[in-house]
Amino acid sequence: MPFLGQDWRSPGWSWIKTEDGWKRCESCSQKLERENNHCNISHSIILNSEDGEIFNNEEHEYASKKRKKDHFRNDTNTQSFYREKWIYVHKESTKERHGYCTLGEAFNRLDFSSAIQDIRRFNYVVKLLQLIAKSQLTSLSGVAQKNYFNILDKIVQKVLDDHHNPRLIKDLLQDLSSTLCILIRGVGKSVLVGNINIWICRLETILAWQQQLQDLQMTKQVNNGLTLSDLPLHMLNNILYRFSDGWDIITLGQVTPTLYMLSEDRQLWKKLCQYHFAEKQFCRHLILSEKGHIEWKLMYFALQKHYPAKEQYGDTLHFCRHCSILFWKDSGHPCTAADPDSCFTPVSPQHFIDLFKF
C-alpha cells in the first residue's frame, strides 16, 4: 500500500500487511547495510589467525574505497544531482504542489558551483552570497548551508589561485563573520539551524580564509610583452572610463604616476557619479573645493554611503513571468509561451532574495 507524501506524484513509502498490522518496508540500501554488518560480525568470529591478515587487507581496501566515495560526496555539491538548472518558484499550495519554494531549495537547485567559474557570473554569485550572509543565513536548511560553504570554499580557492577580485571576497567574508559572531553569541535567541559546534568550526574556517587573503601577494609577471605603461594616454583614459567601481579606479591609479594622474581627473569622477546616482541626490550632498569647484571624487564616496550604487553584471539569473521559473539564460527552461523572450526578466541579487520572502 503506497503512502502519498506532500507531492501526490511521489512514490511514497511502501507498506506491507503482517499479522501484527501494517509495517513499512525497508529500502534496499538499509537491508544491504544490515546484511553487511551481519557479515562483518560473522567474519570476525569465523576467521582464523591465518585468514585474518587477508581479511584485514580486504577491509583496508574497502575502507579506502569508502573514504574516496565519502570525499566525492563531500566535495560534490548536492545541487549537481539535479539535471535541470532551473526551479519553479511557487509561494502557495496547489493541488499538484503542497507547500512553497524556499530560498534554500532554490540555492540547492541552481548551478552556482559552475556559475563561479564563469567570469560573467562570478560577481553576481558573490553578491548573492553576501546578501544571504547579511540577512538570510538562518533561513537556509542544513543541506543549503553545506552547499553555501562548499561554494564559498571554491570561491576563496579560485581567488587564491588566479587573484581575481580579492577585495570583493574580503567584504563577503567580513559580513559573514560578523553575522556568525552575532548569531553564535545569541544562541538560543535566534533560530540557527545545526549544531553550535559546527557553526563555531565554520567561523574558524572563515577566519582562516581571511588570513589567507590578507597574506595574498600578487606575483609580478616577468615578460617582454606589452604593458599598460606602453599604451598611449587616450587608451589608458578609455580603460579608466569603463570602470564602474571607484575603488578599482583608485587601485589602478597606484600602478604608475601616469595612471595616478589620469585617475584624479574630475571629469572621470563626474561621469561615475552620473552613472550611479541621480541629479537630485547630487544637490543634497554637494562638496565644494576652496575655489568653488565640485569635488566629484569625494561626492562619489559620500553618495555611496547614503544611496545604493547601480549594479552591473555580465550575466544574471532570469525569471520567466509566464512559467514562474527561475533559471540561467544560457541553460534555458521548458517555456510554453508563444514568445518566450518577452517573458524573461533579469533578476538582481536583491530581487532573488525578495522572491523567497513570504
UniProtKB/Swiss-Prot annotation:
The keyword Cell division does not apply. InterPro entries: F-box-like_dom_sf, FBX25/32. Residues 1-83 are annotated as: Interaction with beta-actin. Gene3D superfamilies: 1.20.1280.50. Residues 226-274 form the F-box domain. GO terms for cellular component: cytoplasm; nucleus; SCF ubiquitin ligase complex. It is found in: Nucleus. The keyword Transmembrane does not apply. Transmembrane segments: none annotated. One of its GO terms (biological process) is protein ubiquitination. Keywords: Actin-binding, Nucleus, Ubl conjugation pathway. Its main location: nucleus. It comes from the Eukaryota. PANTHER family: F-BOX ONLY PROTEIN 25, LD30288P. Part of a SCF (SKP1-cullin-F-box) protein ligase complex consisting of FBXO25, SKP1, CUL1 and RBX1. Interacts directly with SKP1 and CUL1. Interacts (via C-terminus) with beta-actin (via N-terminus). The F-box is necessary for the interaction with SKP1. This is F-box only protein 25. The gene is FBXO25.
